[in-house]
């Protein structure tokens, strides 16, 4: 049975993953750090939405194009490399490869009603996120999160 996925729910889970990956206590961080974490969670949520939209745009291959598989295929297409090479990519490598697509993704207005970009900045989103937290680490994003939350999510 499909259960609709709230973008806010995904955002909160990503925020929790980031805190855990960096061994940070939600109540032990200052407001400046909190903004960086929220900004990064927003960016990773957009990344996850981009991958899901990519999967849906490839209907004939949709069953295997989810999570990291979709990211690998997108990196292969963008860089014209083999899947064997792309499978070695870390989350930071994938984000670096796809950052323009992520930044350019426009989320639906109903998504933005629930989640606002928590910190407006002239710095490109990826650079802003890396300023405080460093490079993206694999533990920040669980490629199967969407499916665990929804048991085959739908938008």
Where do the PLM segments sit?
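Intrinsically disordered, low-complexity, charge-dense segments enriched in Lys/Arg
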Residues: 125-155
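An amphipathic, hydrophobic-aromatic interaction surface with interspersed Lys/Arg
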Residues: 1-120, 147-155
